[in-house]
Amino acid sequence: MEPTQVAENLVPNQQPPVPDLEDPEDTRDESPENSDTVVLSLFPCTPDAVNPEADASASSLQGSFLKHSTTLTNRQRGNEVSALPATLDSLSIHQLAAQGELSQLKDHLRKGACPACTCLSGNNLINKPDERGFTPLIWASAFGEIETVRFLLDWGADPHILAKERESALSLASMGGYTDIVRLLLDRDVDINIYDWNGGTPLLYAVRGNHVKCVEALLARGADLTTEADSGYTPMDLAVALGYRKVQQVMESHILRLFQSTLGPVDPE
């Protein structure tokens, strides 16, 4: 079986699926009886956009309801169920980073370090992209492996690298709601408003995942509330469409503070 792509352009051919909004915080389903992939969706498809009796002309219009998914497979993570389970020694640097296997990751980096490099920092591997352009740091950020992220950053991993479809460590950490990792990356001066091929920004991903603390952290560091994704959604539009009241309240409070700061102190006279 060919490995599932890490990022897929899922433009619906017939009708867009309706996302499960009952448990918005749980964006990952690793149950082997359901699927061998982990799919993280960005943009919602509202119920009125789904018409089971839609004809061919309507189907073409539904292409505007673009669903951006990042698919991270169990095979790529090295935990695929098989007759011959993978050992840690057989995993790639990307799989080790995704699983947070720090000891093995360090050994892997040392073995691949440049012979002329006395610090053995593994510079020729630490920013190595996989077939989709994902670096070890991007993988670790996507799966919330904060100690691995901290280690990779300390060893010189570049947090500014973008994958082939402009996915970033910050966007994937925001998508997963990994607020501490988001802060670590922002401390390295990454672009807080970086956008991917679909116009998705870290703030849009955090809102889509209903990650309140992550939204707060991004807003506190200056994330742009006015940016629109290619679907036409702003962060506020997205929160309203999905019924995420707490996220909406956080953004409303932020807007109010910005407005008050522009007015300055009120003269009592």
UniProtKB/Swiss-Prot annotation:
Any one GO BP annotation for this protein: positive regulation of transcription by RNA polymerase II
PROSITE patterns xrefs: ANK_REP_REGION, ANK_REPEAT
Statement: the UniProt record of this protein carries the keyword Nucleus: yes
Protein's UniProt keywords contain Transcription regulation: yes
Pfam families recorded: Ank, Ank_2
Start and end residues of each stretch annotated as Disordered: 1-36
SMART domains registered for this protein in UniProt: ANK (SM00248)
Keyword set, alphabetical order: Activator, ANK repeat, Cytoplasm, DNA-binding, Nucleus, Phosphoprotein, Repeat, Transcription, Transcription regulation
Transmembrane segments: none
Domain of life: Eukaryota
PTM section of the record: Phosphorylated by RAF1.
GO molecular function terms attached to this record: DNA-binding transcription activator activity, RNA polymerase II-specific; histone deacetylase binding; RNA polymerase II transcription regulatory region sequence-specific DNA binding
Main location: cytoplasm
Positions annotated as ANK repeat: 88-127, 132-161, 165-194, 198-227, 231-260
Tissue/organ expression: Expressed primarily in thymus, lung and testis.
One GO cellular component, as annotated: intercellular bridge
Location relative to the cell: Cytoplasm; Nucleus
Comment field on protein domains: Interacts with RAF-1 via its C-terminal ankyrin repeat domain. The same domain also mediates its homodimerization. The third ankyrin repeat is required for association with the two other RFX subunits; RFX5 and RFXAP. The three central ANK repeats mediate binding to the PxLPxI/L motif of RFX5.
Role according to the record: Activates transcription from class II MHC promoters. Activation requires the activity of the MHC class II transactivator/CIITA. May regulate other genes in the cell. RFX binds the X1 box of MHC-II promoters. May also potentiate the activation of RAF1.
Quaternary assembly: Forms homodimers. The RFX heterotetrameric complex consists of 2 molecules of RFX5 and one each of RFXAP and RFX-B/RFXANK; with each subunit representing a separate complementation group. Interacts (via ankyrin repeats) with RFX5 (via PxLPxI/L motif); the interaction is direct. RFX forms cooperative DNA binding complexes with X2BP and CBF/NF-Y. RFX associates with CIITA to form an active transcriptional complex. Interacts with RAF1. Interacts with RFX7.
Name assigned to this protein: DNA-binding protein RFXANK
Organism (species): Mus musculus
Lineage of source species: Eukaryota, Metazoa, Chordata, Craniata, Vertebrata
The encoding gene: Rfxank
